[in-house]
């Protein structure tokens, strides 16, 4: 079930984020030829329109932080019949990405999802766009193949959260010189899945928000293994599943942050 929180002011303290830094590995790979293996990827697209009175800030990709929380320690009070701790009491790790740029701090959380390997941003006036995605095989990034059963479980269990706050960061942009890499997931019409979890929006600086998530096979078109979810917050009203990710942003204007 989705949880939407709209902040009318910054009265609430920002949510604490875990503290262990996770570095992603990178190695070249290619699409597997095995029939029951799939390179699953994720594509997250977000468009934020800031409030009219918000100062224009075109400094994108000011900083990107990746943090993975450790798996929580099992409850010592809960034991199985053989006196060992039940694995069901261990929460899966969540990876957080904090992107500062364009006068915003965008915090994303990913649990049981495909790995994020590419992060990019663009800004035009009071509009800030961002994209977080996996990278399809053959582009110099590691992309492990998993079974069909594992892919279906990933589609069912993946959860993405977002927390957008105002930022007064003044440091310069740190745009990378390499091209923006992508997931190569098809953007055809597919069924909706409940992927987006909690969404927090600070209306002190955010006027409108459109947010799209798509998961699919990066090497083979398979409607069974491709789903999407969407969220809109426009003019004070929230709605689910209505975002058209094919025309949400102009991807050609994105610049690589990592």
UniProtKB/Swiss-Prot annotation:
Pfam families from the UniProt entry: Orthopox_35kD
Source species, domain of life: Viruses
Feature: compositional bias, Acidic residues: 68-91
Listed InterPro entries: Chemkine-bd_vir (IPR009173), Orthopox_35kDa (IPR003184), Pox_vCCI-like_sf (IPR036540)
Signal peptide: 1-17
Any one GO cellular component localisation term in the record: extracellular region
Induction: Expressed in the early phase of the viral replicative cycle.
Subcellular location: Secreted
Coiled-coil regions, chain positions: none
Disordered as annotated region, ranges: 65-93
Keywords: Early protein, Host-virus interaction, Inhibition of host chemokines by virus, Secreted, Signal, Viral immunoevasion
Family: Belongs to the orthopoxvirus OPG001 family.
Record-given protein name: Chemokine-binding protein
Organism expressing this protein natively: Vaccinia virus (strain Lister)
